[in-house]
Amino acid sequence: MTMSENSRNLEAGLLLRKNQNDINECRITAVVLFSTFVSVCGSFCFGCAAGYSSVAQTGIINDLGLSVAQYSMFGSIMTFGGMIGAIFSGKVADLMGRKGTMWFAQIFCIFGWVAVALAKDSMWLDIGRLSTGFAVGLLSYVIPVYIAEITPKHVRGAFVFANQLMQSCGLSLFYVIGNFVHWRNLALIGLIPCALQVVTLFFIPESPRLLGKWGHEKECRASLQSLRGDDADISEEANTIKETMILFDEGPKSRVMDLFQRRYAPSVVIGVGLMLLQQLSGSSGLMYYVGSVFDKGGFPSSIGSMILAVIMIPKALLGLILVEKMGRRPLLLASTGGMCFFSLLLSFSFCFRSYGMLDELTPIFTCIGVVGFISSFAVGMGGLPWIIMSEIFPMNVKVSAGTLVTLANWSFGWIVAFAYNFMLEWNASGTFLIFFTICGAGIVFIYAMVPETKGRTLEDIQASLTDFLQ
């Protein structure tokens, strides 16, 4: 055999191995699909909880005689509970595991729905809502992290975006059935996805990256093998995880203050900045009190909620498709641009209405503005910050970073949700003008700071950001 023939055989062998690795990376197994479905049952719970306060407002106020301030507390206290959950989310997810954390969260979610369903006064309403908020605070961190850690890199964005899709499904479901079901029965319906996740969690594998971090190499490989398929060659991916964990183990243990080192600054600024933009754009307040916005704009809230329910799921599906085709960065820019435009439209609509101008058109403008804003949010800004958060932090600081980023999200979400009704009473047009300005600033921030992470391994993304300022 000649040297040239040996060379060709070697090249053919290397090409065959590369193609086999590519096939393994591209494979989407039934285990990955089922594991993702089980985890996003928690996202569905989140969506149901977020939509509940809007459709239940009239019934609860009439039955229990709550004031606007009392109901604002009930509506917003879920975000305060989420803030508490966020403080513990990273540590709990590392100590109990991703699966254990989801199971633990559902205990509080189930208690919360039962407390709301049986409440006789505002105190039990608030306790139940606070408990549900604590649960979704834990879930909002652990679900995208778990999905990012189990999925192949080429579909990671789409699978993590299923988190936002299922939130939209839960929100849409409650927007629809809330018009026909008593608020107590609606709370009991919220128990169904909680129970479904509790049962199905027993049948999915733990995150292989977390098992690797714990030093359970055998269990890590077994989990990875089940996720990639029995006949898949997982050696390269398993070795990458092992090498990364060894590198992190050799360094000092992570503390919150470590996040303020120069090497982690880009990741922290991007993660926290996107969460602040998501909340300060007014998205949470609008979804919690969308009925009030429709009524104030002269559009029937029951019809508006139904329109939203029909539109939100296709828009979230569109985002799931586009996240791997367009990439994270372009989709974020398009989504924030849409939110910016529709905030301005709502500002003009309420301004015209306050001066008695275009009385026949302002309700239509309000409907278009609300539906357009929430649709734009669902396509990108609703889910992408969580995707990027799950990608940009190395395992050695993921606990501290995840806690900080999730805490920032829920803290500002609580402020916006609590103040939203009061801001609308103060000046509806001015309120949406403020949100327009924030969305405009967000476009500049995304363009200047947020990198594209599509199609890259977690280790590659994290290394590039860590070395950015070195």
From Swiss-Prot:
Membrane-spanning ranges: 28-48, 68-88, 99-119, 130-150, 157-177, 186-206, 268-288, 303-323, 332-352, 368-388, 404-424, 430-450
Swiss-Prot/TrEMBL keywords: Membrane, Stress response, Sugar transport, Transmembrane, Transmembrane helix, Transport, Vacuole
Null mutant phenotype: No effect on the root lengths compared to those of wild-type plant under high salinity conditions.
BP term (GO), one: monosaccharide transmembrane transport
Membrane-topology annotation of the record: Multi-pass membrane protein
UniProt-annotated location(s): Vacuole membrane; Vesicle
Effect on the protein of changing L16A: Loss of localization to the vacuole membrane
CDD domains per the UniProt record, alphabetical: MFS_GLUT6_8_Class3_like
PANTHER family, A to Z: PTHR48021, SUGAR TRANSPORTER ESL1
Protein name (Swiss-Prot/TrEMBL): Sugar transporter ESL1
Record organism: Arabidopsis thaliana (Mouse-ear cress)
Record lineage: Eukaryota, Viridiplantae, Streptophyta, Embryophyta, Tracheophyta
